[in-house]
């Protein structure tokens, strides 16, 4: 807690050698740490802070802060605490407790040049208890000299004794340097390693090496490069904030922001007996067809009624050869008492036997139209429909039995056209989904669509099998 070189540099050179007399309370404080004189120079007053080190009034963590609320120093300065880095405030508090000695008193107390040169060494001895044993070994007569001798040094006195005592000057220069860093030495010796006992037993050159080593690392107690600052940095403990920062830098902990959340929606495609086409915006109510048996409104794509499974009228295309025998078939059916409107219904098994002699080709085409029922397009405008429920059931049985056998042979008139995808192979691959299917591509192209999980190109329904 001393000002050091920076504190003394703020005082003019002429005032540094000015003799001052401390006030009684300040003098009592100085004598409590070994001072024996009544007058001092301003430089000695500024640099004599052994009281703070003796009482250990400084903060252990922030050593530049001094707490003196319950001490004599607090009564002297009138403040509970202060910082040694605030030079201006310290100088003001010190000047309040000093009285400048007049020049007449200084001349009356003037002594020889050697006394004026050696007396500061004695004063330093009194103020620096660490260097007291060294001074007793180096010069025993300096202790017996009067303590009230003048400390004024003039340029002429320095020139007269320039060649007289080179060793003393070197030692004095060394003392001035070590005295400026006395508090820094005390910090190192008292707080860190307690080296004061070993330092007292060494001679002057070894002590000078120690002081020079300290002064190399510290220029001033108040500088940023001071011993206390280096000491605090050397033994600095990382705070919690810095520790958290290092952990986050190293990536050892992940915060909630690093978590990625994905929202997944799972749709369960449950199959029903009848495919639902109500969600298709392209299909309007006008496209629905009405069953002739039960008057049920059915979607346009399924060929069978959802309620009674009756085949839709005009589902399959009408053969030209069939138009030739429409009149004769109609007359025979009317004779048998069967209701056949417009002659567009397919004949029953009895009617087929009766018309075999007149139109042999009709029976062949009827069987072909029944076999190709599963592979026809829903967009055809005309078809042949069975007239009873028994015929419908028989047709369904034949459809399941002959489905795999007639994949390539049973084509409708629309199946003669090439595949709409490759435009090269015939339409022999039926895309089946639910109870319906579409014949619009060849078998290889249909397999590719199924393998790639593509929907049906016609109705956009998921493909179940080919």
Swiss-Prot record:
Sequence segments annotated as region (Interaction with PYHIN1 and necessary for interaction with RFFL and RNF34): 140-216
GO biological process: apoptotic process; negative regulation of apoptotic process; negative regulation of DNA-templated transcription; negative regulation of transcription by RNA polymerase II; protein ubiquitination; regulation of biological quality; regulation of cell cycle
Region entry Region II, spans: 228-317
This protein's UniProt keywords: Apoptosis, Cytoplasm, Metal-binding, Nucleus, Phosphoprotein, Proto-oncogene, Transferase, Ubl conjugation, Ubl conjugation pathway, Zinc, Zinc-finger
Source superkingdom: Eukaryota
Location of the motif Nuclear export signal: 176-188
Amino acid composition bias (Polar residues), ranges on this chain: 365-389
Motif position, Nuclear localization signal: 169-175
Necessary for interaction with USP2: annotated span: 1-101, 262-466
Pfam families cross-referenced by the UniProt entry: zf-C3HC4_3, Zn_ribbon_RanBP
Zinc finger (RanBP2-type): 285-314
Residue ranges of domain SWIB/MDM2 in the record: 18-100
Record region (Interaction with MTBP): 160-292
Region (Disordered): 109-174, 197-223, 238-260, 319-407
Post-translational events: Phosphorylation on Ser-156 by SGK1 activates ubiquitination of p53/TP53. Phosphorylated at multiple sites near the RING domain by ATM upon DNA damage; this promotes its ubiquitination and degradation, preventing p53/TP53 degradation.
Domains as described in the record: Region I is sufficient for binding p53 and inhibiting its G1 arrest and apoptosis functions. It also binds p73 and E2F1. Region II contains most of a central acidic region required for interaction with ribosomal protein L5 and a putative C4-type zinc finger. The RING finger domain which coordinates two molecules of zinc interacts specifically with RNA whether or not zinc is present and mediates the heterooligomerization with MDM4. It is also essential for its ubiquitin ligase E3 activity toward p53 and itself.
Protein name according to UniProt: E3 ubiquitin-protein ligase Mdm2
């Amino acid at each position: 807690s001393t000002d050091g070189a920076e504190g003394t540099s703020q005082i003019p050179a002429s005032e540094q050698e000015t003799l001052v007399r401390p006030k009684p309370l300040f003098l009592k404080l100085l004598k409590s740490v070994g001072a024996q004189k009544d007058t001092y120079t301003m430089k000695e007053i500024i640099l004599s802070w052994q009281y703070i080190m003796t009482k250990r009034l400084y903060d252990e963590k922030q050593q530049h802060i001094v707490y003196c609320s319950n001490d004599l120093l607090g009564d002297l300065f009138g403040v509970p605490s202060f910082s040694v880095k605030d030079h201006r405030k310290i100088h003001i508090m010190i000047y309040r407790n000093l009285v400048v000695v007049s020049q007449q008193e200084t001349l009356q107390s003037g002594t020889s040049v050697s006394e004026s040169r050696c007396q500061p060494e004695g004063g330093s001895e009194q103020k620096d208890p660490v260097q007291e044993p060294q001074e007793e070994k180096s010069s025993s007569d300096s202790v017996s000299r009067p303590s009230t001798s003048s400390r004024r040094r003039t340029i002429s006195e320095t020139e007269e004794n320039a060649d007289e005592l080179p060793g003393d000057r070197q030692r004095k220069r060394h003392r001035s340097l070590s005295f400026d860093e006395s508090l820094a030495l005390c910090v190192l010796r008292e707080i860190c390693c307690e080296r004061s006992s070993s330092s007292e037993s060494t001679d002057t050159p070894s002590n000078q090496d120690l002081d020079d080593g300290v002064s190399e690392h510290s220029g001033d107690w108040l500088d940023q490069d001071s011993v206390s600052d280096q000491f605090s940095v050397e033994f600095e403990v990382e705070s919690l904030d810095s520790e958290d920062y290092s952990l986050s830098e190293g990536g050892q902990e992940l915060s909630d922001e690093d978590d990625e959340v994905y929202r997944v929606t799972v749709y369960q495609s449950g199959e029903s007996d009848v495919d639902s086409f109500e969600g298709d915006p392209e299909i309007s109510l006008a496209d629905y067809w009405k069953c002739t048996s039960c008057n049920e409104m059915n979607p346009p794509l399924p060929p069978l009624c959802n309620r009674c499974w009756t085949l839709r009228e005009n589902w399959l295309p009408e053969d030209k050869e069939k138009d030739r025998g429409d009149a004769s078939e109609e007359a025979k059916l009317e004779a048998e008492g069967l209701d056949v409107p417009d002659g567009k219904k397919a004949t029953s098994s009895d009617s087929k036997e009766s018309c075999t002699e007149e139109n042999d080709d009709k029976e062949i085409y009827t069987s072909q139209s029944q076999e190709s029922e599963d592979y026809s397009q829903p967009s055809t405008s005309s078809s042949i429909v069975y007239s009873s429920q028994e015929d419908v059931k028989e047709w369904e049985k034949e459809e399941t039995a002959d489905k795999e056998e007639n994949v390539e042979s049973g084509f409708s008139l629309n199946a003669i056209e090439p595949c709409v995808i490759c435009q090269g192979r015939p339409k022999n691959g039926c895309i089946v989904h639910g109870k319906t299917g579409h014949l619009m591509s060849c078998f290889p192209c249909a397999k590719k669509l199924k393998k790639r999980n593509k929907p049906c190109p016609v109705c956009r329904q998921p493909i179940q099998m080919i």
